[in-house]
């Protein structure tokens, strides 16, 4: 029990020991300077820089730079349901070509999603007078597409993390334990969910769908103040340093071409 408590304390410290204020001053100054550059050089040049950064930052920083999120079953099923009943393309598919975001889920999500398609979808179809067989076919197809772009992880070997996850959320819903276990064991930035059970714990950040969309929009627009909410200060400074170095490399390249 003592060992279990120490593990929990370590995780609490690790998740909360983020010296964001030290980085924020630098971030604010950077944005101020960046706005001046945008006014001087124009939007076309800024778009060029944005494309360049998105293409090269992942290469420079590797996997450290990616926003890693665990996604729960209800989020995926709601996407499937909207596609089948309303014809809306799942927003989660927008993540497929984004180099800065990775989605994860435990193996359990496959069975849970299948169960919801078999048992919950027919009830929804009946209310909306939608053909059940056609709806199931469409649901299975889009669910497979979504799952194929999520990293499904078998968490059977994460015993210590499972114990911590049980202590955090097991009293609310044991089915949520694999999702919390995965978020802890992979050192992710949180879980995308609408499930209120997850909010009982304070260790893992819980993301709303809208928050994730904002991050994606910020990335697409080339903003450099995006989403470093749960990243440690050293990595934050490493990111900024790499951005500055990249800018200097671009400027140097332009100067060489004009000489």
From Swiss-Prot:
The keyword Hydrolase does not apply. Signal peptide: none annotated. Pfam families: PIN_2. It is found in: Membrane. GO terms for cellular component: membrane. The keyword Transmembrane applies. It comes from the Archaea. Keywords: Membrane, Plasmid, Transmembrane, Transmembrane helix. InterPro entries: PIN-like_dom_sf (IPR029060), PIN_dom (IPR002716). The chain crosses the membrane at residues 235-255. Disulfide bonds: none annotated. This is Uncharacterized protein MJECL38. It comes from Methanocaldococcus jannaschii (strain ATCC 43067 / DSM 2661 / JAL-1 / JCM 10045 / NBRC 100440) (Methanococcus jannaschii).
